[in-house]
Amino acid sequence: MTIRKIIVLTLIFGLTLHAVFLNPSFSEENPRSDISVNSLSSKFPNDWVTTGTSLMYGISDDAGFMVSEDGGARWETRNVGLPVKWIYPYNDAEPRTLTALAVDPCRPERVAVTTARQLFISEDSGRTWREIVFSKPFPAAAFVTAVALSPQEPKAIAVGTAYQGLYETRDFGKTWVNLTPHLQFLYQGAGFYEEISALAYHPQDGKRLIFGCGFGKGLYQLHRESGAVKLSGFDPESTSHITGVYFSRIAGDGKKPEFWQLSLRTRSHTAHYQWDPIQKIGETKHIEPILDDEAVQRRLQASNRFGLYLRPDYASGRRLDEKLSFMKENGLNTIVVDFKDDSGYITYNTSLSFPKQIGAVRSQINIREFLKKAKEHRIYVIGRLVVFKDERLYRYQNCKYAIWDHKTGKPWGHFVKTTDVSGNTVWVQREFWVDPYHADVWDYNISLAQELESLGVDEIQFDYIRFPTDGDLSTATYRYRRKGMEKVDALESFLRKARAALRVPISTDLYGFNCWFNMDSWNGQNMAIFSKYVDVICPMYYPSHFPSAFMKESGYLERARQIYRQGTYRAEQIGRSRSLIRPYVQAFLLGGERKMDKATYSDYLKRQIQGAVEGDASGFLLWNFSNQYYMVTKSLAEFLQKLQGQQDVRSEE
């Protein structure tokens, strides 16, 4: 398997482009204020729509909403009235990431944009904005991925989501209607629907919606009364991963009458079709320049790494020798080892003073000897650092850095009920979390990463880079949260600072669902944003951790393969190929899985690996906290070689 080119989707026209930027001021007291964008790096939109005239609209990851009135020769930002984010280094507010864009094809001055959880409409090409408020039955936790404006009903707006279906208002948000019952064919189980990735009203019939499904699931037409049908007549590549559906009116030229054009946008191109009858009339290719040389080199270094997790007490002596032999037998070339564990202990002989000051050093690894031996065996070493779950830092200076419990006025924790030796019921704290908003917490972890880099560790892996998800979260409060910051902003700030401080590849571990769907509200993990800073995303697609009702149509073993196959592909799409995808493989049994016999659990493991390879993962990592990799019953080397050969043939086809 060869490393795929890592690309940033940037609009490049066949002429020189220039950007015009506004320069208003920002007030931290008003997080939806005028913002300065002079310092932003992106000058062109990464998603855009034409209107049939020289007027164009776009959205940029960095610059927000953009407008061109001359066909793309010049762009300016119009973000006054749109939300901003306040993240490190806090020099200026930055536009909050926009997730969708729509234009009224009959009145092109009407335009709408969304963030993950908000909707805004402008009647004057973005000069002023008005928020359209979501209310029940629109789900509070929905992640918005698509929006459409009706040309027939000015107050009608449709909104698509990442996993909770499709909704419509016909009165500017006073009431909402759930259209999802029409879309049962998109149901994936356990309350999750396939993503609505693109959306447009039919230009002549306000009862009809055209929508695209994410991840290659096609293009559909929904009628409010008669339901949904899949549309045909389009090239397969036009509907492979639709990110935009737009109508525009094309004027006649004397030889050909006026007609409606439907544009289908994907990451690689925009295909243009005459609408009804459907006929392809052209396409626009999107030029995809590669990342800068340093980023490309980091990804080359991190690509195609097949390995396992090594506990610190297995990182020396006979145990290490046994694991190195096991790796050689199975064609593995990578070790992930805890250098800061789940309790906050530093497991190597650090020279930093602060870990010693907080009582965090429990040296189990002579790091120089360990790295020397690993290099002798040509092993790529990934240093795992558990970031925000950290009992040692939590307890420091009377819990200075702890998440706080606003109800008790004490440090917040995740407590579980248990029985003590006397048979009494007691509550025991299971998890200790520090505040992800505190810059001292970021700096502490980054200093460890820098030390590991200087010692020769090949890659830094940040784990538990999220907010807590268990316990009574309703009482958790974050004392160091700046006004206007959201959970995702704290994590982005940390990653931005870490990226600037480190030269080696950075990887992050993410929940499986956070790589399967666009989401971020519950634990702050937004994979699309993470991929701007890290070289590798490691989804934890453990089949046992997915709800049993999710993808239940497949048998349990085939379900495991599909979770990794589809999940790897979906993660690559969500991250826009900016990060390599290297999933963790479940090399342990949980719950009812423990009843599996040897042949079954061996097959279970191989199905996961097979799915990852078929999804074009850049390697994988076996995870078993006990370090007893009993599910590997036969050498993986030949199995991997065969799988990769099959995948290379598919790629050539």
Language-model features: where?
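Aromatic-lined carbohydrate-binding/catalytic grooves of carbohydrate-active enzymes
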Residues: N330-Q364, L636
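Catalytic domains of carbohydrate-active enzymes, especially glycoside hydrolases
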Residues: D321-G344, L455-E459, V536, G615-G619
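Aromatic-lined carbohydrate-recognition surfaces of secreted/lumenal glycan-active proteins
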Residues: I382-V386, Q461-F462, K487-N523, R578-F588
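An active-site-proximal structural segment forming one wall of the substrate-binding cleft
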Residues: G317-R319, F326, N330, R430-Y464, ...
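Aromatic- and acidic-residue-enriched segments that line the glycan-binding/catalytic groove
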Residues: T347-I358, D390-N424, P468-K483, D597
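Extracellular glycan-interacting surfaces
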Residues: T2, L9-F13, L17-V296
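Substrate-binding cleft of secreted/luminal carbohydrate-active enzymes
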Residues: D535-S548, L557-Y564, R570, S579-Q647
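Active-site-adjacent "subsite" loops/lids of carbohydrate-active enzymes
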Residues: R298-A315, F388-E451, K606
